[in-house]
């Protein structure tokens, strides 16, 4: 399905600033749909006069009347005369069920049209769809307050003053109309507060009604932090004076945490009050704090495991120095390398907030010490080409162990003892599904008759076990094209069954 940007690029020649404004409108119009109890469609006009629907929104506060997906619909201008007239004249209008007989909208619901102005140009038209009976029947206090606010916002939309560019980001995580709605008059007095808004204020410690009370006078004594209370006071005053912009803020009061979003209502250059959306997020914040505490505990555990492993590595290193048996010393040094590799993974996890390990950072920290613990005297250059990316902690340790074992195996066994130097290269290529790693050396190549499955090397046995049991991956060894050996490792990025090369 085409996005709004794709449809605008395909059917219009609007400048980038106008396109950004339409994106901002779509970012805000869920609030419009909820306040109106109505569906909205956004129409643009092509150069040939044909109308194209580029976006659609359904209300959360009532039933939808547009049951089909209208996005991408292309209609002639004479099929929607009211929309075409609004593009030309820039004036809102309404079409009842009777008047729709000559229109493409003929399913018994009323349609109202509103221009979307950017600068001096009507860049789009919104059609609002609601049942004919709902548009005519007498509304309750909540519906009346919602619809009056929606009318003000639509007039601001027609004047090009809504939405404000700075409001787009905050709208994505703001309270919804159904969470709690407060309407202020020009003096800051609450003219309407929805039941959910009143409940949120009661959680904050209010013991009286909100309607008919100055919002600042009711709110300021409830807020725990005096600086925060002063900030809310100043913001609401600026909002009512027409000098302020909308704001999103969290307020702690009476042991509760509420999320507030303010919307200035300025119609025809005149301040007509403000709308406040409010949501009680006390339980959400409590869960957030619990998760933060849990994450901190997990990171502390990783930190302590890293410290313990480093202590074990230091003891093994000390024992290796005191051991006179060459074979025993080599085994201890290999153990030091393996323990150090695992310690580095836990070190990375102790600094991670999402249990994800940056494999490139860990590998780059391990590679410089590989030569130091090797039992060969010749210098071996070790390089990494490509990005390994990030992996979940469950498999990161296993993959790091596999790569370090393969590199160490190449350092120890791939080169002629008489060779002056050599090189080992780790090549990584990652797609959406796979992580492919090739450990290449420019040594002697595989011995004749060598079999990975029959090898009695402890390092390769560890590698085979980890690849099959922990990584659900596949492993193969082959002679390189020019010289040396390629060890080919393929690991699924997601959880998958075992694969064979």
From Swiss-Prot:
Residues 4-150 are annotated as: GAF. GO terms for molecular function: ATP binding; phosphorelay sensor kinase activity; protein kinase activity. Keywords: ATP-binding, Cytoplasm, Kinase, Nucleotide-binding, Phosphoprotein, Stress response, Transferase, Two-component regulatory system. InterPro entries: H_kinase_PdtaS_GAF_sf, HATPase_C_sf, His_kinase_dom, PAS-like_dom_sf, PdtaS_GAF, Sig_transdc_His_kin_sub2_dim/P. It catalyses: ATP + protein L-histidine = ADP + protein N-phospho-L-histidine. Changing residue 43 to A: Loss of activity, cannot rescue a deletion mutant. Residues 300-495 form the Histidine kinase domain. One of its GO terms (cellular component) is cytoplasm. Autophosphorylated. Pfam families: GAF_PdtaS (PF12282), HATPase_c (PF02518), HisKA_2 (PF07568). The modification Phosphohistidine is found at residue 303. Its EC number is 2.7.13.3. It is found in: Cytoplasm. Residues 179-291 are annotated as: PAS-like. Binding to c-di-GMP activates PdtaS autophosphorylation and by extension phosphotransfer to PdtaR. At the opposite, autophosphorylation and signaling cascade are inhibited by NO, copper and zinc. Activity is not inhibited by calcium or iron. Full inhibition of PdtaR/PdtaS signaling cascade requires the transduction of a cell surface signal by the intramembrane protease Rip1. GO terms for biological process: phosphorelay signal transduction system. Was identified as a high-confidence drug target. The N-terminal sensor region is a monomer in solution, but it forms non-covalently linked dimers over time. The N-terminal sensor region consists of closely linked GAF and PAS domains. Binds c-di-GMP via the GAF domain. Copper and NO are detected through a dicysteine motif in the GAF domain. Member of the two-component regulatory system PdtaR/PdtaS. This two-component system plays an essential role in mycobacterial adaptation to poor nutrient conditions. Nutrient deprivation results in increasing intracellular concentrations of cyclic diguanosine monophosphate (c-di-GMP), which binds to the PdtaS sensor and promotes its autophosphorylation, leading to the activation of the signaling cascade. The phosphate group is then transferred to PdtaR. In addition, the PdtaR/PdtaS two-component system controls copper and nitric oxide (NO) resistance downstream of the intramembrane protease Rip1. This coupled Rip1/PdtaS/PdtaR circuit controls NO resistance and acute lung infection in mice by relieving PdtaR/PdtaS-mediated repression of isonitrile chalkophore biosynthesis. Two signals are required to fully inactivate the PdtaR/PdtaS system and mediate NO resistance: a cytoplasmic inhibitory signal through the PdtaS kinase mediated by direct sensing of NO and the production of PPE1-5', an NO-induced small RNA, to sequester PdtaR. This is Sensor histidine kinase PdtaS.
């Amino acid at each position: 399905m085409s996005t709004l940007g794709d449809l605008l690029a395909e059917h219009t020649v609007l400048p980038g600033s106008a396109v950004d404004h339409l994106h901002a409108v779509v970012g805000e119009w869920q609030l419009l749909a909820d306040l109106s109890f109505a569906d909205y469609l956004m129409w643009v006009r092509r150069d040939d006069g044909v109308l194209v629907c580029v976006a659609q929104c359904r209300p959360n506060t009532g039933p939808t009347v547009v049951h089909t997906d209208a996005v991408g619909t292309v209609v002639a201008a004479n099929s929607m005369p009211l929309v075409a007239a609004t593009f030309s004249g820039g004036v809102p209008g309404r079409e009842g069920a009777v008047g729709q007989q000559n229109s493409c909208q003929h399913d018994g619901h009323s349609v109202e049209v509103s221009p979307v102005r950017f600068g001096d140009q009507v860049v789009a038209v919104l059609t609002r769809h609601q049942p004919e009976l709902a548009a005519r029947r007498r509304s309750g206090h909540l519906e009346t307050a919602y619809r009056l606010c929606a009318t003000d916002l639509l007039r601001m939309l027609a004047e090009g003053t809504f939405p404000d560019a700075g409001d787009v980001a905050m709208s994505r995580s703001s309270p919804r109309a159904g969470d709690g709605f407060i309407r202020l008059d020009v003096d800051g007095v609450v003219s309407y507060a929805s039941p959910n808004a009143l409940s949120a204020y009661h959680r904050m410690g209010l013991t009286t009604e909100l309607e008919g009370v100055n919002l600042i006078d009711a709110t300021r004594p409830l807020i725990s932090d005096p600086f925060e209370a002063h900030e809310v006071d100043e913001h609401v005053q600026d909002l009512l004076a027409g000098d302020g912009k909308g704001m999103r803020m969290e307020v702690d009061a009476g042991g509760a945490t509420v999320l507030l979003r303010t919307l200035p209502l300025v119609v025809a250059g005149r301040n007509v009050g403000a709308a406040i959306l409010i949501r009680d997020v006390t339980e959400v914040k409590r869960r957030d704090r619990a998760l933060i505490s849990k994450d901190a505990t997990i990171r502390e555990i990783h930190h302590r495991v890293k410290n313990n492993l480093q202590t074990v590595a230091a003891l093994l290193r000390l024992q290796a120095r005191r051991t006179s048996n060459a074979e025993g010393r080599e085994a201890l040094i290999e153990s030091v390398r393996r323990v150090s590799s695992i310690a580095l993974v836990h070190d990375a996890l102790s600094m991670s907030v999402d249990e994800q390990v940056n494999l490139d950072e860990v590998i780059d920290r391990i590679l410089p010490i590989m030569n130091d613990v090797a039992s060969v005297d010749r210098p071996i250059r070790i390089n990494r080409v490509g990005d390994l990316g990030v992996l979940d902690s469950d498999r990161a340790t296993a993959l790091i162990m596999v790569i370090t074992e393969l590199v160490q195996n190449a350092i120890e066994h791939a080169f002629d003892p008489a060779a002056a130097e050599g090189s080992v290269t780790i090549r990584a290529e990652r797609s959406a599904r796979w992580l492919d790693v090739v450990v290449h050396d420019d040594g002697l190549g595989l011995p004749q008759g060598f079999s990975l499955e029959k090898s009695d090397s402890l390092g390769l046995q560890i590698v085979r076990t980890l690849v099959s049991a922990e990584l659900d991956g596949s492993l193969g060894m082959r002679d390189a094209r020019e010289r040396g050996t390629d060890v080919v490792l393929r690991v699924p990025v997601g959880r998958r069954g075992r694969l064979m090369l």
